[in-house]
């Protein structure tokens, strides 16, 4: 196996026994809504009671999904690790329409290049991502997220799991208190 000089920081917050896995696509409006609730969930349920694991679910109908997802993973290799990745997710969420296509097929992003998208994310997040994005074997981490989703039958975002089991009754539209109740139920 090839030795690498980089490490993608796992996108994990909290250290409790109940595990809440969330598969998100960074430009999906429903994923953005779910992402915006994760800090509040950790605060309400308690980092000693739950663990949140963020998984990335790139989806081809979100046309620049692969580029944006790779930017998130690239950010996780920087000094700030998962917090840098979270900053990229927050920047994309705050400006979601600037990373998406009109009706998944048109609009201003038709003329955008991957470098334009990276520069846009850098501008909004305040992070320099170019070198990390260009790590030759960074796709290994991208593929890990993809394989994890596939082996678990994840097809849409967001998808929520509690202790490894898909929970289709949980929605991005739910209140944080409802998520906490699901997680903390005996």
Q: Where would I find each of the regions flagged by the language model?
A:
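A short beta-strand-turn-helix
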Residues: 2-18
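C-terminal cap of thioredoxin/glutaredoxin-like
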Residues: 8, 22-27, 32-43, 111-186
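Glycine-centered flexibility motif
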Residues: 13-14, 71, 156, 169
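Functionally engaged cysteine thiol sites
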Residues: 14, 74, 132
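Residue-level signal for cytosolic alpha-helical hairpin/rod architecture
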Residues: 17, 68-69, 126
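Structural alpha/beta surface segment adjacent to cysteine/selenocysteine redox centers
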Residues: 21-26, 32-118
